[in-house]
């Protein structure tokens, strides 16, 4: 998939204030400082469209970017930032959880994990939450430039082995590095397949409650 145009649309404090749910959305999430906004910029081909920072917790709202006038990429707040106040964490958790549970045009959630680290408890709990609520997701491993090629192979195998028992079907994995553009084509191809296969809004937790 070739990106011809990508524009920032809006930042929202709640899923109810997000743009109309008339296009497929691919959202990005991960622990704070996993390289989420940098990855969004790499995929979009723009260095500063999504705001990045060495300080965790920079993204605090639901940020929508319209791509090729056809679909949205969404930069979500990261989770697991210990330095955030309890009130901040509660607010972010509520905002993100409601978006994931109720946003009917969420076609796929890209869960970003640092490839240098073994699967973390907070990530595994989050992935189980996605599975329990039938939220479609794929795994994106970041910062692959920080380790050797053999370590990348070994870590990828570790993630697949760890996550396999929890998932009902095989997951899509993409190995990336925002620094050297590794995995950009693979990520774009994955997004292209998701957008091409998007047909109708998914059944959300809100739909089930009605």
Curated annotation (Swiss-Prot):
Keyword Nucleus in annotation: no
Cited SUPFAM superfamilies: P-loop containing nucleoside triphosphate hydrolases
Residue positions binding Mg(2+): 37, 59
A GO BP entry: division septum assembly
UniProt-listed PROSITE patterns: G_ENGB
GO molecular function, one term: metal ion binding
Binding site for GTP: 30-37, 57-61, 75-78, 142-145, 174-178
Pfam family, one: MMR_HSR1
Keyword Metal-binding carried by entry: yes
Function comment: Necessary for normal cell division and for the maintenance of normal septation.
NCBIfam families assigned: GTPase_YsxC (TIGR03598)
Family, as annotated: Belongs to the TRAFAC class TrmE-Era-EngA-EngB-Septin-like GTPase superfamily. EngB GTPase family.
Name under which the protein is recorded: Probable GTP-binding protein EngB
Classification lineage: Bacteria, Pseudomonadati, Bacteroidota, Cytophagia, Cytophagales
